[in-house]
């Protein structure tokens, strides 16, 4: 028998003890769409606190011109 709706424990892509820093641009780019939008938590798999910290870091990096607000390549 299969149990529908059971997914098991989700593993966060970033270890919980690691700090999310606005200077780690390569890490932040993994959580942004091609158009520059921040991916939602249900897609990233982060914890609630990590998602909040990620959002703050991305917004801070945008203000310091490390990341673009909108990617207009396409």
From Swiss-Prot:
Protein name as catalogued: Small ribosomal subunit protein bS18
This protein's UniProt keywords: Ribonucleoprotein, Ribosomal protein, RNA-binding, rRNA-binding
Pfam families membership: Ribosomal_S18 (PF01084)
Family the UniProt entry places it in: Belongs to the bacterial ribosomal protein bS18 family.
Originating organism: Gloeobacter violaceus (strain ATCC 29082 / PCC 7421)
Functional description taken from the UniProt entry: Binds as a heterodimer with protein bS6 to the central domain of the 16S rRNA, where it helps stabilize the platform of the 30S subunit.
InterPro entries registered for this protein in UniProt: Ribosomal_bS18, Ribosomal_bS18_CS, Ribosomal_bS18_sf
GO molecular function: small ribosomal subunit rRNA binding; structural constituent of ribosome
GO biological process, one term: translation
NCBIfam families assigned: S18 (TIGR00165)
Xref: PANTHER family: 30S RIBOSOMAL PROTEIN S18 (PTHR13479), SMALL RIBOSOMAL SUBUNIT PROTEIN BS18M (PTHR13479:SF40)
Gene designation: rpsR
Single GO cellular component term: cytosolic small ribosomal subunit
Assembly, per entry: Part of the 30S ribosomal subunit. Forms a tight heterodimer with protein bS6.
Xref: HAMAP family: Ribosomal_bS18
């Amino acid at each position: 028998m299969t149990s529908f709706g059971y997914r098991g424990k989700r593993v966060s892509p970033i270890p919980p003890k690691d700090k999310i820093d606005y200077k780690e641009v390569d890490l932040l780019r993994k959580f942004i769409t091609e158009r520059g939008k921040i991916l939602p938590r249900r897609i990233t798999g982060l914890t609630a606190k990590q998602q909040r910290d990620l959002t703050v870091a991305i917004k801070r990096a945008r203000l310091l011109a490390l990341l673009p607000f909108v990617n207009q390549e396409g």
